[in-house]
């Protein structure tokens, strides 16, 4: 279990660092979300087995180890919550959109890419990121 925990911890730390780095210096909240989507996807499809272990094995953990991973995951999701809150506070998200549900469904959809993405296949990570961004922009963002 300690090997799983170490791999998962590294994956979550890498995810947080990757997201923070992607949005660092960008003050426009819409652009932060777009950059965040792409950073998350790049991490997923970048060939790191740590991410797969995190996504598909975390339920194997128990007790303190499981709680530690939940806490680290929650910290990562807090970065997304802050970006969505910024959009909402600036009136950029439709009033009928639940930010928490948007975050959960959005990250779930992005994470599922790891199960079907094929390097060299029909879609690149950029294609997927652009598509996800278009869906969010056209379905969630106020015009």
For the regions a language model picked out, list residue spans one by one:
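Alpha-helical structural segments
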Residues: 2-24, 31-42, 53, 71, ...
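Short alpha-helical
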Residues: 2, 10, 14, 49, ...
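Active-site Tyr-X3-Lys motif and surrounding loop/helix of classical short-chain dehydrogenase/reductase
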Residues: 68
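C-terminal peripheral helix-coil segments that are non-catalytic and often amphipathic
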Residues: 39-42, 46, 78-90, 107-109, ...
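Amphipathic alpha-helical segments used for helix-helix packing
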Residues: 45-64, 115
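Hydrophobic alpha-helical bundle segments that form small-molecule/ligand-binding pockets
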Residues: 21-26, 62-65, 74-102, 117-120, ...
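Short, conserved alpha-helical segments within structured domains
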Residues: 33-36, 57, 61, 98-102, ...
